[in-house]
Amino acid sequence: MTPNSLLSAPSADGVWHHCHLLPDADPARAIRDGALVVEHGRIAWLGAAADLPEAWRGAPRHDANGAWITPGLVDCHTHLVYGGQRADEFAMRLAGAGYEEIARAGGGIVSTVRATRGADEDTLFAQAAARLQPLLAEGVTAIEIKSGYGLNLESERKQLRVARRLGEHFGISVYTTFLGAHALPPEYADRADDYIELVCNTMLPALADEGLVDAVDAFCESIGFSIAQTERVFDAAARHGLRVKLHAEQLSNLGGAALAARHRALSADHLEHLDEAGVAAMAEAGTVAVLLPGAYYFLRDTNLPPIALLRQYGVPMAISTDHNPGTSPVTSLLLMMNMACTLFRLTVPEALAGVTAHAARALGADDRHGRLAVGRVADFALWRIDSPAELAYWFGRNPVATVVRQGRVHAGAGAAA
């Protein structure tokens, strides 16, 4: 996309007709032979085409050619901005090395830290843009992007600045998350408490004051940070009025999900080792469970998240790519829907909610994204499908016809432009 192509993308204003509408993930609320009106970049009306108010019958028309229109998709957990890649570690995994073994050998997160620190902002932007474009082409209109590969103030700032720049350049809603407590940088080896002090008292205050942070995250694991260290990060976030989320219970059960719930976290993510007490705490707090089937698949995990318990307690389940260079180098949210159904046994409506309303809730943005509703910014996707179930059914195929982001039309294979 050229620098001015966002402004040159045509307006979505007018009546979208010859379509079927899925306002949210509930198939009972689907509207066949529907119409949707966009005015000044926002949804002004939606319903059955036969009920279109007279006031809009003379408005410009957009023929959807029988497509289904859904809310724009939301990718609520990504590590999209980083330097380099880690294909060499893939070979190590195939030879039997595990996540912890690679990390302790100096690979993993810290190897990406070296590449990220060594890259300038323009290089990081170009690399991240290439990763973002396939997601845009699949109908993603809102995305979370974490830092966590800088692990010092300068490089964390660089990552977050690139994330903001991606949103401005592509006309997509980007929600930034400060993940300074992702791993120990080499210069703080064996000094985790000192590093957490830097995160809480230097990095977070500076980045929050610069308006670069929407939420705060941490990696609470035996190879990451302890419950006590994570709580210090959460307390610092609260002092700056920032919501929190947590990488929790991926490799073991440290009680991270319960900690997240005590702090009314937006989400707890991964959760392969989550127990019933953690599920109950999340339910009481309204914390979203973000499922990351790409990492589960890539790591060849065998411990499933407790889907039945999450259902039983009414915990909202979101689905995300977890795009990152080490454990989920995937750029397809549609594939994650299929994996969530096939690997985790989610239903199709659960998968649809997982990439729309529940994903938006995991960002604290369910008042802006995840549903087609009057008054909201026009973020939606048109699909060449006979039924919304096909979005979770196909894999390796992108049935998108048109994507509307922030009231602008991005068509067909050029939906990422």
UniProtKB/Swiss-Prot annotation:
It catalyses: 4-imidazolone-5-propanoate + H2O = N-formimidoyl-L-glutamate. GO terms for cellular component: cytoplasm. Fe(3+) binds at residues 77, 79, 247, 322. It is an enzyme of class 3 (hydrolase). One of its GO terms (molecular function) is zinc ion binding. Pathway: Amino-acid degradation; L-histidine degradation into L-glutamate; N-formimidoyl-L-glutamate from L-histidine: step 3/3. GO terms for biological process: L-histidine catabolic process to glutamate and formamide; L-histidine catabolic process to glutamate and formate. Belongs to the metallo-dependent hydrolases superfamily. HutI family. This is Imidazolonepropionase. It comes from Cupriavidus taiwanensis (strain DSM 17343 / BCRC 17206 / CCUG 44338 / CIP 107171 / LMG 19424 / R1) (Ralstonia taiwanensis (strain LMG 19424)). The gene is hutI.
